[in-house]
Amino acid sequence: MMRFPRFTMGGEIFIMEAPKNLNHQELLQKLDLVGCGAVVSFLGITRGHDHGVEIYRLEFDAWQDKLGNVLRLLAETAIESFGVSKVAMAHRTGPVKAGENIVSIHVASPHRKQAFQACEWLIDELKIQAPIWKKEVSEHGEKWKAGLG
């Protein structure tokens, strides 16, 4: 795990590396929620199927030297753009079986509207900007997917 001690405009950021077993509750507990009236969370899970094809697992490869920095910059931008107080994020790397957690994002804020907006923006931008690649292993074999979406 790595915690970036950076505080932005009163905001706290926590980024966790998650090569195995992403525990979203543990990630949420890293945030000090004093002064927050809302927490909005997103938990991405491997579906196990895609257009009728059984998916056994997804395999995520990441540019580890850059991943933490990209997630931190996304969190900083969310704090500054939406006025939220705290952000915690983690994304799995390696194999992730059907039904297992892939990504967890928690956004804490004095008010819910900003937390919802920031959380949605964070997952959308993570899928675009994070240096992570996804391989799908299914009943039809293996294939690299374009983007994380």
Task: Please give the residue ranges for each predicted region.
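N-terminal, polar/charged subdomain of small-to-medium soluble alpha/beta proteins
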Residues: M2-N101, A108-G149
